[in-house]
Amino acid sequence: MELVFIRHGFSEWNAKNLFTGWRDVNLTERGVEEAKAAGQKLLAAGYEFDIAFTSVLTRAIKTCNIVLEESNQLWIPQVKHWRLNERHYGELQGLDKKATAEKYGDEQVHIWRRSYDTLPPLLAPSDPNSAHNDRRYAHLPKEVVPNGENLKVTLERVLPFWEDQIAPALLSGKRVLVTAHGNSLRALAKHIIGISDAEIMDFEIPTGQPLVLKLDSKLNFIEKFYL
């Protein structure tokens, strides 16, 4: 069986080189075109889906919608869930990556961005931009809404959704599309493929490129490739 991942198209804060995380920003025109191209690639390659999973952030939802529209599958069920959100970058969210590197040093920022288990500076729950003040997450217990995450914590957040929804869908024979974010998809890929803590630092997923994971009937990883 095959599982398709798509990282959302290029966003407004990708263009501005800002840390984004759980902040909700839109796609750029380039991002829209990337999503259209991804949908057209899937259509040309004959990929059909029974269900699509995405996050509750605009850039991923719009990418999912565009991909499905371009591949003539906008009618299939979509599940939007906070567990597929991007990694929460804590106090770094909204900051310029270059300016942050100048302030703290390239090595420290690289560790914050790419280390598997180093947390960024945490955002105060009382901060106006905290997810605690966003009605998208008002139904959640306060203790599960993050104030900052590393990739390890992101995987711990994403894994229950894999086990409860994505894996059962695949095992039931459904063809699955997951349109999410660089780090939530990296976390899932780490689990599925078996990437080591060290190797995951250099594992990247480009925006708007369909990544196909080939799995056996028990969801063991066989191979991966981009369309």
UniProtKB/Swiss-Prot annotation:
Keywords: Gluconeogenesis, Glycolysis, Isomerase. Belongs to the phosphoglycerate mutase family. BPG-dependent PGAM subfamily. CDD domains: HP_PGM_like. This is 2,3-bisphosphoglycerate-dependent phosphoglycerate mutase. The keyword Isomerase applies. Substrate binds at residues 7-14, 20-21, 59, 86-89, 97, 113-114, 182-183. It comes from the Bacteria. Homodimer. Pfam families: His_Phos_1 (PF00300). Its EC number is 5.4.2.11. One of its GO terms (biological process) is glycolytic process. Catalyzes the interconversion of 2-phosphoglycerate and 3-phosphoglycerate. The active site is at H8 (tele-phosphohistidine intermediate), E86 (proton donor/acceptor). The record marks H181 as: Transition state stabilizer. GO terms for molecular function: phosphoglycerate mutase activity. It comes from Haemophilus ducreyi (strain 35000HP / ATCC 700724).
